[in-house]
Swiss-Prot record:
InterPro entries: ORC5 (IPR020796), ORC5_C (IPR047088), ORC5_lid (IPR048866), P-loop_NTPase (IPR027417). ATP binds at residues 303-310. One of its GO terms (molecular function) is DNA replication origin binding. Residues 105-160 have a biased composition (Acidic residues). The lineage of its organism: Eukaryota, Sar, Alveolata, Apicomplexa, Aconoidasida. GO terms for cellular component: nuclear origin of replication recognition complex; nuclear pre-replicative complex; nucleus. It catalyses: ATP + H2O = ADP + phosphate + H(+). This is Origin recognition complex subunit 5. Residues 27-47, 100-166, 194-238, 409-469 are annotated as: Disordered. Component of the origin recognition complex (ORC). Interacts with PCNA1; the interaction occurs during the trophozoite stage but not at the late schizont stage. Residues 227-237 have a biased composition (Basic and acidic residues). It comes from Plasmodium falciparum (isolate 3D7). Keywords: ATP-binding, DNA replication, Hydrolase, Nucleotide-binding, Nucleus. PANTHER family: ORIGIN RECOGNITION COMPLEX SUBUNIT 5.
Length: 899
């Protein structure tokens, strides 16, 4: 048992995407026992036998043995076709893990079909002996399993009655098997690197070597069985009874004609990761994308928050190995501001270039290209200046295809002399003899010096070479004829802030080739492009501006049963993560050494095993969903948040030893958190309103208007406020009081407001006035002398404070362009705003600069400011409430100083 430390957890319980990083079917109930029927066992034997056949192929290198094995492969395929009562998804997983599969099963079957007519006499006897061995094995199985005889007999009757009755289905199933082999080779290309780079050129085996091959076949089959058992045990948590019930033969019978064979494996893998709750949406997305050769240009993904839109789309695109780029428009817009357009351009090009580089490296290893390098990441600059630059770089990335490289390579190889080619063949032969017999069967080049005795083998090897070249073309088509995908998440933020960028991205197919008179891009064909827009609600038609409303994939809300299934599967992550965040020093969580999915909770003398914890968790999830689903079904993130934070409160009485972990105490545990649930679900749609009212942003008594400035900056702001509110004629009183060394004399009590006083007079008094720079400094000096007994010395510190206030926009230069004021309109007999409405800090660009620039000295990096002479007109841009709070903090009677 190993203790889990608090810092070992990487899961954020507040984020739905992070908590679901593990496989969606990662947990199988400890109380569930996997029940397998004889039919289920028979299917497992068939899949394992087919895998053993592939293992045997890698152990032998003769053409005769390959013909023999093809017959076994055909028998296993026929048995798979006939046994369509149930299809075990575990068999697909074993096929994924089998790294010794051939690259192109169609080509091998074609070759073997041609060789069947010539070599019937060679392998008929062997097949008969194999059948006898199979019969002996079946007899032994019948003796050992007497209870299942009737089921097996019934299943064999079904096989005999339904044999080849549905030829269309058998053809489709064969094509699907071949397609699965191709998909698995592409998915497992990283594992097949060494095998694809090596080409075996072996001699035909003599009769004395037959015993060696048979023993090697048996050893390989045993090793493959052991490896498959280990892998099935290791990855057994990916599959449970629910998957086996959902994925049946009838399910695949309807599924195979509707889904392109090239992406069938990616579809199944995405279902394993994301769950069957989004099967309908994934099927709709596949119908729109097709085989990714010519997808729809723009696709819209819509759904409420927490419904798995981004997770499903990104996982499916990754599993198809298509070059793609992902941009979160929310982060790009609100983190970059004005430069959001350049950030989005750079993110798209950077992600796309990295994926294209990975695609090219995979293509090189598949086709054995070593003398050529291509790095698309070097085409992407660090800063994308404008839209034209973005489209030109994107055109270069999408117009690259390695066809010319291969053609040049083949022509140079054909020009070589025969002696050089023979020497190269000998070198290859020596290398392959030293490395062993571990490469693919399609790459077996059995070239011999004994041409008279082995003419048939030599011809077959030549045909294999041709097939390998066609396989190269297949991978070229597979990789470079597919389209590129751009995923734009939270697109509504891009529409609000940069509608021109949204317009360009949705019409990227038109702009990528530039103007019609650009001859450099005329004859270059580019790859297809698909834009996937992810949003919460549909965009209005006028946003698309002539572009038809794109087809939509709706991610509707999860049902209550779906929510329960998802939370059941989050047991390993959410259950213990929420307990680790709970502040309890006595609580300790352990996991089992041989199985890290089984946990044990210990607190003082209370010990809870994994089965008990899981049973309590399932009952807790049922209670939470039944109570709060109606309130939080539109936001799954909130439901996850409630579930994770209520769990420690729910299980606390059991951990404290107050209640026993039995079924009779479940009602007491529910009553313990019933009050918390009612509070959490009360006004769930507006539960932040009271927090905002009581927050620092809306409460006058808190720190809302407090500005973190120095002492002299605050004094300068108060002096600027007095200069903007009082007329210059009233400054004499302040100067006289300062010269005499006394305090300010309080003004006489103001007269009451005159009823006949016009609104224009009141507005003129309330509007802040501009003031000169020398007047601002003099009033500030008066405040320092009278209230703090200091003098304002214009040193470097004061200059720096003045520079900071101007650059922050608190004090700005007075001009008709950046000053908003009310003026009288003689035509309308009223008042109106003059200039820009609002703060000059937000509406002018001349006030933005770095704090390192100084307005008192000219530097190369400084922005263009007006000269700050003593009579420069300035204006204050700070709210009056903020000034009053500063005056209260500094104990300055502001109302008494305003005349």
């Amino acid at each position: 048992m190993y203790k889990i430390k608090n810092n070992e957890s990487d899961i954020n319980s507040d984020d739905c995407n992070e908590t679901a990083q593990e496989c969606i079917y990662g947990f199988s109930s400890p109380k569930k026992s996997r029940k397998e029927s004889p039919i289920f066992v028979q299917n497992n034997d068939d899949t394992c036998s087919s895998n053993n056949i592939y293992e045997k192929k890698t152990c032998s290198n003769t053409s005769a043995s390959s013909v023999k094995k093809y017959d076994k492969k055909e028998q296993s395929l026929c048995s798979d076709i006939n046994n369509y009562n149930k299809v075990n998804i575990e068999g697909l997983k074993i096929n994924e893990r089998n790294y010794d599969r051939i690259n192109n099963s169609e080509e091998e079957t074609n070759i073997n079909d041609d060789n069947n007519d010539d070599n019937n006499g060679d392998y008929d006897d062997d097949n008969n002996s194999d059948d006898d061995d199979d019969n002996d094995d079946n007899n032994n199985n019948d003796d050992n399993n007497n209870d299942d005889d009737e089921d097996v007999d019934d299943f064999e009757d079904i096989k005999e009655n339904d044999e080849y009755k549905d030829p269309t289905y058998s053809d489709i199933y064969k094509e699907a098997k071949k397609c699965n082999i191709r998909c698995e080779n592409i998915m497992n290309s990283s594992v097949n690197k060494k095998n694809l780079e090596e080409i075996n050129e072996s001699d035909p085996l003599n009769s004395s070597d037959n015993s060696m091959t048979s023993s090697s076949e048996e050893s390989c089959s045993e090793e493959s069985d052991k490896e498959s058992d280990k892998e099935s045990d290791k990855d057994g948590n990916l599959y449970d009874e629910e998957l086996n019930e959902i994925i049946e033969e009838g399910y695949f019978k309807e599924l195979i004609p509707a889904i392109p064979h090239d992406i069938l494996q990616a579809y199944i893998s995405c279902l394993k990761i994301c769950g069957f709750e989004r099967q309908v949406q994934l099927h709709r997305l596949i119908n729109l994308l097709g085989d990714l050769r010519d997808p729809i240009s723009v696709i819209q993904i819509l759904g409420l928050p927490g419904m798995g839109k981004t997770k499903v789309v990104k996982n499916f695109i990754k599993l198809t190995n298509v070059p793609f780029a992902y941009v979160n428009c929310l982060m790009a817009v609100y983190q970059s501001g004005r430069s959001a357009k350049n950030v989005i351009y750079h993110t798209i090009l950077k992600d796309l270039s990295i994926n294209l580089l990975n695609e090219f490296n995979e293509y090189k290893k598949i086709n054995n290209i070593t003398n050529y390098s291509y790095d698309p990441t070097k085409l992407v600059p660090n800063h994308v200046s404008n839209t034209d630059n973005f489209f030109s770089i994107l055109h270069k990335l999408l117009s690259f295809k390695p066809e010319d490289i291969l053609n040049n390579k083949r022509t140079t190889e054909n020009i070589r002399s025969p002696s050089n080619s023979n020497n190269n063949k000998k070198k290859k032969k020596e290398q392959n003899d030293s490395t062993g017999k571990n490469s693919k069967e399609e790459c077996n080049n059995n070239e011999d010096d004994d041409d008279d005795n082995n003419k048939n083998n030599f011809n077959n090897n030549n045909s294999n070479n041709v097939r390998f070249n066609s396989n190269t073309n297949y991978y070229k088509d597979k990789l470079y004829d597919r389209s590129v995908v751009f995923i734009l998440d939270n697109i509504r933020y891009l529409v609000r802030t940069h509608p021109d960028l949204f317009y360009a991205l949705t019409r990227i197919h038109e702009y990528i080739k530039g103007p019609y008179n650009d001859v450099t891009k005329a004859n270059k064909t580019t790859r297809g492009l698909c834009i996937i827009l992810i949003n919460r609600s549909p965009l209005p038609d006028e946003i698309f501006d002539g572009l038809p409303q794109p087809p939509t994939v709706w991610f509707d809300s999860y049902t209550s049963e779906m929510c329960k299934n998802i939370l059941y599967r989050l047991y390993n992550s959410m259950c213990f993560e929420s307990l680790l965040t709970y502040n309890d020093k006595d609580l300790k969580i352990y996991y089992v050494k041989h199985n890290k999915n089984e946990f044990l909770i210990k607190r003082n003398d209370v010990i809870l095993e994994n089965d008990v914890i899981y049973d309590i968790w399932c009952r807790y999830v049922d209670y939470i969903i039944n109570v709060s689903y109606k309130d939080y079904k539109s936001d799954f993130h909130e439901l996850l948040f409630i579930c994770s934070h209520m769990w420690p409160l729910f299980i606390k009485p059991i951990l404290d030893g107050v209640l026993e972990p039995i079924v009779e105490n479940m009602n007491a545990l529910q009553r313990n958190i019933d009050t918390h649930i009612r509070v959490a679900t009360y006004n769930h749609s507006s539960h932040f309103t009271f927090e905002l009212i009581d927050s620092v942003f809306l409460n006058e008594n808190n720190l809302k208007n407090k500005i973190d400035l120095s002492f002299y900056s605050k004094i300068l702001l108060v002096g600027a406020y007095l200069a903007s509110r009082n007329l210059p004629l009233t400054d004499k009183r302040f100067f006289n009081a300062t010269v005499k060394g006394g305090a300010f004399t309080l003004p006489k009590k103001r007269k009451g407001k005159n009823k006949n006083e016009s609104i224009l007079t009141l507005l003129s008094k309330s509007i802040p006035k501009n003031f000169t720079f020398i007047r601002w400094l003099c009033l500030t000096d008066c405040l320092l002398v009278c209230f703090f007994d200091e003098q304002l010395i214009l040193n470097s510190l004061i200059c720096q404070q003045i520079n900071t206030l101007i650059q922050l926009g608190f004090i700005s230069f007075s001009s008709p362009n950046n000053l908003s004021c009310l003026v009288r309109n003689s035509l309308m007999n009223g008042v109106q705003w003059s200039g820009y409405c609002g703060s000059a800090l937000l509406n002018t660009t001349t006030n933005f600069s770095s704090l390192t620039n100084n307005i008192f000295c000219e530097t190369n990096n400084s922005m263009t400011y007006e000269s700050l002479d003593p009579y420069t007109k300035l204006v204050i841009q700070v709210p009056e409430e903020t000034i009053r709070n500063i005056s209260k903090e500094m104990k300055i009677p502001l109302d008494e100083l305003i005349i």
